[in-house]
Amino acid sequence: MKRIEPGPGQESVWDYPRPPRVELSSRRIRVFFADTLIAESTKAYRVLETSHPPTWYIPREDTKTEFLISGKGSSHCEWKGVATYWTVKVGDQVAENAGWSYEHPSTRFTAIARHLAFYPSRCECYVDEERVQPQPGDFYGGWITSDVVGPFKGSPGTWGW
């Protein structure tokens, strides 16, 4: 693994902390599914963790919850706690477990309680006007933009980092 050095206006995921940091942002965050706006906010939080592109958590009040139904299963993050999954449904189009939230996160992450994160591999996600690229693999939900460099955890062979 060779770290990519950030250029002007970029940040490296290898400079992000562990345990992760929560950071409020005023950038415009949008999520679409089936050509429908699901969420839009300028009050989202980024969670920054070593080796991962940022994961964005959108306030529930900035999300059109009428398009969300309870998803299947749950997972546990060593830092944030138990994640609840959400399925996005617009008309007859469905994205299973396309989003998640931490309804009752650990103390360090209370800022993101009841906020929603979405997988850019299952929804169209934007930071400002840039369409996000999904973090490799299908477990982590990081958002890759041109201002973040890796390499990123998630691809085959990176799980042991």
Regions of interest found by a model, annotated:
Residues 1-161:
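Terminal leader/tail segments of proteins
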